[in-house]
Amino acid sequence: PPLARNAYERYIHRLLRENDLYGHVVFTGSLNAQQMKERYLKSQVFVLPSSIENSPNSLGEAMLLGVPCIASDVGGVRCLMTHGVEGLIYPADDPHLLAYDICEMFAHPEKAAQMARAGREHAGKTHDAQKNLEILHQIYTEIAR
């Protein structure tokens, strides 16, 4: 196990050790955009286990790349996906339901793939850089008047 640099890392490493999870978790360190894309595409499921979020870019990125997604019900997550349609959403304070949802993704790969396709299509609309730039430009133009 790597040397933990702070209390949170020590906590994470303790959990990994206690649950015999070393070898199942990868700490990547900093990644450039291409490396991040490669990691996303190697993933069988993307999990956003946040307790606080606004509009999580990482969720949008995973959806755009067609990775099945599970996210905690915080911030703007419900604006990015609908539970059971583009992915799964669970209460942020329910780790047991998160574990269940992860197992469901693996137990039903056809359903996971269907949600991933729907997520990719939806994110293609909500995360279209050119469209979002035009909308922002229009908003700022209106404000400036």
Annotate each language-model stretch with its function.
Residues 37, 56-64, 78-79, 85:
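Short alpha-helical segment that forms part of, or immediately flanks, the ligand-binding pocket
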Residues 51:
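Aromatic "clamp/platform" in nucleotide-sugar-dependent glycosyltransferases that forms part
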Residues 9-30:
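Nucleotide-activated donor-binding/catalytic signature segment of Leloir-type glycosyltransferases, i.e.
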